Amino acid sequence: MVQTDLRTAAWVCIAALSAIHSGAFASTTRDLPWYLEADSTRAAPASIQSAPIEPGQALITVAVIDSGVLKDHPALKGVLLPGFDMVSGPRNLRGGRSSNFEPDARDTSCGRNITSSSFRTHGTEVASIVAGNGYQNMWGVHPQARIVPIRVFGACGMAPDDMIDAIRWAAGLTVQGVPNNANPARVINVSIAGGASQCRPALQTAINEVTRKGTFVVVAAGNNFQRALAEPANCEGVISVGALSAENQITNYSALDPRTSIYTVGGGPPLRNNTPWANNKLRVATVEVGITGAENLVVADKGVGTSFAAPLVSGFLSLWLSHRPTLRPADWQSYADHFVRSVPQLTKCPDCNPNGLVIQQNIVKEKR
């Protein structure tokens, strides 16, 4: 979960999402990520054991509003659509907004000491969880989805107004001075948190606009160690996503708030057992730096945080919408009861009532 300057029973999407299309996984089921595993001998408690679900006929676009995406990563080949760099003003070291959605270079300093390289890798990692194409077994939840990458932060941080413009542009709304998005998203993933304790009116207005248009907004709850939701996860109309461990427990780093819509796999410290899920990390497309300083585009089991829980939900929604493209955000509550099961409650939040998503055989296709 990237921290930047920047609902009542908490449905918990245990988006292990073994309910992925069988065609894509037919030859690779022995090395699926543990959170996608359907095999009962390899499925973690936080996994869903269900029959694979073929994607529907509708092509669904997911916007990833993040640090940018590495367009040449082989795990995202054939997945990416044209995106945009929405970073404005002095924070944009390239001089201004453009169609170059790639992240800042790893050695970018922005005039201060950078202690994290997340601005280089974060967006690519998030996008791969949504729609990774199977390269080195980097399977996303819905590989047939298409990703529109939108960069809103880099080495110099993020301006709150850039987030508003990014959300509007992602859904196909007009943003002054920016060409229109030719591929409006049905799902917007925002794996960014740490903003204000109340949703700013301008941001809430933007979210209202895009949800009325039929776009789902999925937001990471934040890694604030069981404190209340911060912006943008505290805005009305978003699907805010907290994190579970492989053992189906709400993690100690996840935000904890009755308004949290869903908890799903976010990973954590390695488990002290020999299970296939003992690593307790999510598989991501990322960058490895060699001894010479050169970057290698790799796949690694290293993802931990609500940042990585959110794209599991975004991937599930895109899979669901591929069968039911007319569904809108207002429809989610009427469907959610068909997708939930309980997970252990924390005494620290007696009003949270967390439940988990169960994808029964063909439920995505058959539920009317």
What are these regions (language model features)?
Residues 11-20:
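Bacterial N-terminal signal peptides
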